[in-house]
Amino acid sequence: MPFPDRSDSPPAEPPAGRTGISATLAANETLERKRREGVPVLPMAFGEAGLPLHPALRRELAEAAGRNAYGPVAGSPELRAAAAGYWTRRGLPTEPGLVVAGPGSKALLFGLLLVIGGEVAVPRPSWVSYAAQAALTGAGALFVPTPPDEGGVPDPGLLANAVQRARRQGRDVRSVVVTLPDNPTGRLAGEPTVRRLCEVARELDLLIISDEIYRDLVHDPAHAVTSPAAYAPERTVVTTALSKHLAAGGWRLGVARLPDGPRGRTLRADLLGAASEIWSCAPAPVQRAAAYAFGEPPELAEHVTRSRGLHAAVAHAVADRFAAAGCRVPRPHASFYLYPDFGPLAGRLAARGVRTGPDLAALLLDRYGVGTLPGSAFGEPDGALRLRVATSLLYGEDDEQRLEALASPAPQTLPWIARSLDRLSQVLAEVTAPEPALAGSPAPW
């Protein structure tokens, strides 16, 4: 099901140099506070992978715990070689000298925006931190809608028009960020869109930053990820990390693949200069474990396969509940996100005083303990009745439950996940009922 046309919607970008706390982190902190107060919650705002670390990763980290010296700014040779192999196996031949490691791909993305300079074009909707990081560099973001039924990549034709118009106005747009697969929609842009994006980037001399942190969580392995590095290798930076497919978000370890050639070497030198002044080097013990992880031994490859299946099963089960409530729900292709649109229910919501995405997210959180994020957090106008829903914290209250979910052929039927799904349906039925029923207390769990 295609997304509605958003080409006339105004961009929502923070003022240059200023930003508040990340919307995802703020929502997660609110949910944790409610949980501590004894309030039942459905935590679907924070994009954490929600699974225990594989024992092999804990072993590798423990064995490297004594590594307390600073290392190379670009990362250890073993890590850079392992990351190069990871990309080469995915059809992107990579030399270790093109790899830069950092304390998470988020830090690398900020470093790249900082040294590239100028404004950055971003998809609308797109991950909350792209525009915020652009603001922190003192520049700004140019929001460009995604094509219908796709996510993560600005519509190439609209991108060309938007950049040319911005430049005529004196704005200095130098780069474009894409997310393959996408956060917030869980969708994956097709090969024709990515290929045309590369053509536009070459015509307009834009650098491409391709955030591929969810690449290994595509639900159907036959649904291939097309990286812009395959079509515009001379101007594409690719980033990834351990946070999503291996659920190691707290380890803060990411890697970037810089373009080959003179431009790439200059960009790499600039990035290393910034890195040397900001983070010095990625944590040495984590680099050792990351080198093991990017080597993709069979035990970790199997773990990622099972994780992918769990994410797919629960994300689609949650999508079914939103669809049953009357929402438009583009089916997710990857990861643990979906992006339901309550537009068809706008009249019923207005009867409850809900007229914007932030209104809707606030109602779900404050009254029902259901955490989501409004589309406005991802660059949409406030009036968009769309929510980003993350399903990965529904897998269990402890590691025993989460591991059982990981091993289950039908995790959505496990009692604790089924209860969460039923609670979600109950809340959605109450919120979207033809007649308002909000005067008293919400229905109990």
Each language-model region and where it sits:
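Conserved glycine-rich beta-strand-loop-beta hairpin in the small C-terminal domain of fold type I
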Residues: 308-316, 323, 329-348
